A protein has these predicted regions:
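Bacterial N-terminal signal peptides that target proteins for export
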Residues: 1-10
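Electrostatic cytochrome c docking/interface patches
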Residues: 23-61, 101
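C-terminal capping alpha-helices of c-type cytochrome domains
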Residues: 38, 107-122, 129-159
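Detector for the c-type heme attachment site
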Residues: 44-47, 67-75, 117, 121, ...
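Gly/Gly-Pro-rich "capping" loops immediately C-terminal to redox-active cysteine motifs
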Residues: 53-111, 130-137
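Extracytosolic ligand-binding ectodomains
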Residues: 158-166
Length: 166
């Protein structure tokens, strides 16, 4: 448990330091460790730190983003459906990305929120119908979830496939 707290605190510090050096208004804000813990619980289980099940368009209970996108956010394939990488460096790549043959621009915090809650990508297109619309998130829970997503990208930033063009 103590190791997990050290990891989360270190990840939060890394996110803070990396965002503090940027002058872009579209950069992501750093988030506190307690908020990261709530975001992690939502991501992993679909349940808030207060024990509230987050409602979604598929009526799933006790499952979160990790069920499809994986614990590291890198996606893959689930039941034959391609599941995209949702790490922040991938989503915010200024070159955009192509998924399912459709190119989209880079995401920012607001477009990530739209993807999570409304199922709309950064180009204004509907996401795959299998992507649940997480309608039961409070504004704080949504910010906490995005804060946790930032740690997934921060931890992976040095990996070989992420080093190109960042």
């Amino acid at each position: 448990m103590a190791l997990r707290r050290v990891f989360l605190a270190s990840a939060g510090l890394l996110v803070f330091l990396s965002s503090a050096t940027s002058g872009s208004s579209q950069e992501f804000r750093p988030w506190l460790a307690s908020h990261l813990e709530n975001g992690q619980r939502i991501y992993m289980s679909g349940v808030t730190a207060q024990g509230r099940v987050v409602q979604n368009s598929h009526g799933m209970e006790g499952v979160g983003c990790a069920m499809c996108h994986g614990p590291d956010g890198r996606g893959g394939t689930m039941h034959g459906i391609p599941v995209p990488n949702i790490t922040v460096p991938f989503l915010t790549d200024p070159r955009g990305n192509e998924h399912n043959g459709r190119k989209r621009p880079a995401y920012n915090e607001e477009t990530i929120k739209a993807a999570i809650v409304a199922g709309i990508d950064s180009g204004g297109n509907a996401l795959h119908p299998e992507m649940p619309r997480w309608t039961g998130l409070t504004a704080r829970d949504l910010d906490d979830l995005i804060g946790f997503l930032k740690t997934l990208g921060a931890v992976r930033r040095g990996s070989p496939d992420m080093s190109q063009g960042l």
